[in-house]
């Protein structure tokens, strides 16, 4: 694509032409925002669904095989060390994808559940047989509508598609029946708050 070739001005022009024809095209809106420096609160649901439905079959080979992706193992090690021994209890994987962190953390859980926007990713996660329950849902939708009774909420490279995280924090704090903990990874920015990058992903500052 023009974006992948680094032809950003041409890419913006092409996406704006698409928006002139279909103004409500969420994916095009998101990409134009990312390329023009406009920070929105989150990536549109349809954009994320389409991105990962299309990426699902080559996701693990791309990340684990080609990029030696280690975040799930690192995050699991952090949680287990912080917990200080024994089982973690009930864990909810927010944006479980193909189940990479589920495979790492399963043996430390009494109950492991996962949610994701991509049906294709969920199929691959289900095939691993590490989750006690999987749900096709948006994070805010799930946290708002479901009963929450978890010891840990984990999220691996998912908040890079959610800029404004205050609703996530608020819902977990207000609705969870236990004194649960949230452990997650983000991409870093030196700017205040959060920023939508040209990649279409969000970065967050440490202070945020």
What function would you assign to each model-found segment?
Residues 92, 98-142:
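Class I SAM-dependent methyltransferase SAM/SAH-binding core
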Residues 166-179:
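A short glycine-rich, Lys/Arg-flanked "PGG" loop and its adjoining helix->strand segment in the class I
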Residues 193-208:
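Acceptor-substrate binding/catalytic loop of class I
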Residues 61-77:
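Conserved SAM-binding loop and adjacent beta-strand
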Residues 154:
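A conserved beta-strand element that flanks and buttresses the S-adenosyl-L-methionine
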Residues 179-187:
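Conserved beta-strand signature within the Rossmann-like core of class I S-adenosyl-L-methionine
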């Amino acid at each position: 694509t023009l974006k992948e070739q680094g032809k950003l001005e041409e890419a913006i022009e092409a996406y704006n032409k698409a928006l002139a024809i279909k103004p409500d095209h969420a994916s095009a809106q998101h990409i134009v925002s990312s390329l023009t420096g406009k920070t929105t609160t989150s990536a549109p649901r349809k954009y994320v669904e389409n991105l990962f439905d299309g990426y699902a079959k080559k996701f693990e080979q791309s990340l684990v095989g080609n990029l030696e992706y280690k975040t799930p193992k690192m995050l699991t090690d952090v949680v287990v060390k912080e917990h200080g021994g024994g089982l973690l209890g009930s864990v909810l994987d927010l944006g479980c994808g193909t189940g990479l962190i589920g495979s790492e953390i399963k043996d430390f859980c009494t109950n492991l559940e996962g949610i994701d926007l991509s049906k294709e990713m969920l199929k691959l996660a289900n095939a691993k047989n590490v989750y006690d329950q999987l749900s096709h849902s948006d994070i805010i939708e799930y946290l708002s509508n479901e009963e929450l009774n978890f010891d840990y909420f984990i999220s691996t490279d998912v908040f890079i598609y959610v800029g404004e995280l205050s609703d996530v924090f608020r819902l977990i704090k207000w609705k969870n029946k236990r004194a649960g903990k949230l452990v997650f990874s983000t991409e870093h920015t030196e700017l205040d708050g959060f920023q939508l990058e040209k990649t279409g992903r969000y970065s967050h500052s440490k202070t945020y």
